[in-house]
Each structure stands twice: as structure tokens, then as C-alpha cells.
Amino acid sequence: MIKKIGVLTSGGDAPGMNAAVRGVVRAALSDGLEVYGIYDGYQGLHQNRIEKLSRTSVSDVINRGGTFLGSARFPEFKDEKVRAQAIQNLKMHGIEALVVIGGDGSYMGAKKLTEMGFPCIGIPGTIDNDVAGTDYTIGYFTALNTVIDAIDRLRDTSSSHQRISIVEVMGRHCGDLTLMSAIAGGCEYIITPETGLHKEELIAKIKEGIYKGKKHAIVALTELMTDANELAKYIEDETGRETRATVLGHIQRGGQPTAFDRILASRMGAYAVELLIQGEGGRCVGVQNEKMVHHDIIDAIENMKRPVRKDLYELADKLF
């Protein structure tokens, strides 16, 4: 049985990452394992910034946003020599397995280490909710509340000025955060990678609302779909209504994690340790139908796809 494990957070931070680290540390210590924290993700792993953690190391972190271990982008980890040095650093401390908390990019690093013979378990931590093999990722629901709060505030001022507002939401190539926040926030139109951008339909929908006497309209837009400010100008030119774009940006990644994210992160952290004790490696954990599951990390990255929530898109269309 393994005796020492490491844990790191990688990629964009997400509320609940601290709770996940805490779950890993305390579950491992309860089962008689030693735990080492790696600071600043794969970069810190390569630079040997590794420190032994205790129960008190993770005291008072469950309610904190961000990640106390830190995170960093480190594209150099694609280099096999860099990964070999990382593995050497792990072995120097006697670490036999690694828990990686992050999104798809972080999983790729874990996959590469697994292929080089070092067992890793991936935990999905990203507000984008774009990781395969799980219904929800850590941080998603906290970010959802942040976006909804912003939409509520935009609705107030948009109504006062009879204005059209575009709110740009994170998500990269996944529209889950935009979709759910649009439904919960009562937006009038949604643009995501799953729906595509249809300008004529958008203008027709807005004009229909104006004709019916609506004082405002809120358009929820997933980042990278189009330039939000250019779209605002286009809408204003076509409708004659003042239109403003609000890019929420990194505010979506911060803040205290919700109860759901804290519990999800704690469950996933403890489950990752359980898998390592059972001798599993090269896996990623998830939650499906409220049950903890695990998948081959290579299969999750290369073959598994997140299902499109057609039922929710249909609901959104009816409600808008």
C-alpha cells in the first residue's frame, strides 16, 4: 500500500479547490498516509516546491476561495525532460502517487505522468464545468451564483435606462455556465457554443420584446463566441436602443465557495485518496447522479464528451 501522496492545484483557480485539498489531506491522514502539498501547480512540481502537510495546514481553508497551494500556467510541462525532473522530485520526497485538481489542461499533465509510470488521480476543479466524466465540476455552482448576482444588478440598471445589456460569461467552449445563469437570471437571449451566434434571430427577438413594451433586454454570451462590445454596437445600430456590454471576467473565479461546492470538493478529495489506497492510478473522479464515480483519465480526455443539455436549452427558449 502507498504511504505518501502529493496534491497540487493547476490551471485556472476555482472556488472549492481549498476544500478539495483539505479533503485529500484529512482523508489521507485519517488512513495513515503522509501528504505533501506542491505549490504553484506543475511549475512548483518541476521546481521542487514541495512541503509536508498536516491537519492544521488545512485548517480554516474550507470557506476560502482560490487555492492556498497556488496555481500557475506551465506549458513547459509538455516537455518529457521537464516531466522526468518532476517525477524525480516526487520520488526524492518518497511520494508514490499524485492528486491533481484542475481542468482539462491539468488532466493532460496527469495523463502524461501516468503514461510515464507515475500514478495520478484527477479531480475536476474549474468554473467552466467542461470536464468529461462528471455532472459538475468544483467551483461551477459558486461561479453560477456570482454570475446570477451580476445579472440581477444589470437588470436593475438596464430597466431604469431602458437599455439592452450583454453579459459575457466564462466557459471557454462549454456553455453550461451561460445557460444556467441565463435561465436563473431571466435573460432574454442566450449565445453559447452549443447554440451558435445568429444575429438576425437575436435582433428579431429583441425587437419583438421592444414591440411588446419591454423596458430592457439582457443577452447572456459565452466568452470567445464574439467580441461583446462589437456585438453591443451592432445591436444598438439595428434596434436604436442603447446597448452596453459587461465582461464579468475573473470575478467569476473568486469568492467563498457555496455549500454545494464545499461538500462536492470534500467528497471528491476523500474519494481520490480511497482510489489510491485501492491501488488505482491514471483515473479521474466525478459525480454522476449524485454518486462518486471514476474513469480512465486518458479515456476521459480523448474519448468522453460532455452531453449537451438539450432539455435545458428547450426550457430556456420557452422562458425567454
UniProtKB/Swiss-Prot annotation:
Where do the annotations place Mg(2+) binding?
104
* GO biological process, alphabetically ordered: canonical glycolysis; fructose 1,6-bisphosphate metabolic process; fructose 6-phosphate metabolic process
Localisation:
Cytoplasm
Q: Name the EC number(s).
A: 2.7.1.11
The UniProt annotation places ADP binding at 22-26, 155, 186-188, 212, 214-216
From the UniProt record, list the reaction(s) this protein catalyses: beta-D-fructose 6-phosphate + ATP = beta-D-fructose 1,6-bisphosphate + ADP + H(+)
Kindly give the PROSITE patterns that the UniProt entry links to this protein: PHOSPHOFRUCTOKINASE (PS00433)
Pathway(s): Carbohydrate degradation; glycolysis; D-glyceraldehyde 3-phosphate and glycerone phosphate from D-glucose: step 3/4
| A GO term, aspect molecular function | metal ion binding
Q: Which residues form the active site?
A: 128
Q: Which GO CC terms are listed, alphabetically?
A: 6-phosphofructokinase complex
Q: What's the protein here called? A: ATP-dependent 6-phosphofructokinase
Origin species, per record, is: Photobacterium profundum (strain SS9)
Which family does the entry's similarity section mention?
Belongs to the phosphofructokinase type A (PFKA) family. ATP-dependent PFK group I subfamily. Prokaryotic clade 'B1' sub-subfamily.
User: Per UniProt, where does ATP bind?
Assistant: 12, 73-74, 103-106
What does the annotation say about its assembly with partners?
Homotetramer.
What does it do?
Catalyzes the phosphorylation of D-fructose 6-phosphate to fructose 1,6-bisphosphate by ATP, the first committing step of glycolysis.
What activity regulation does UniProt give?
Allosterically activated by ADP and other diphosphonucleosides, and allosterically inhibited by phosphoenolpyruvate.
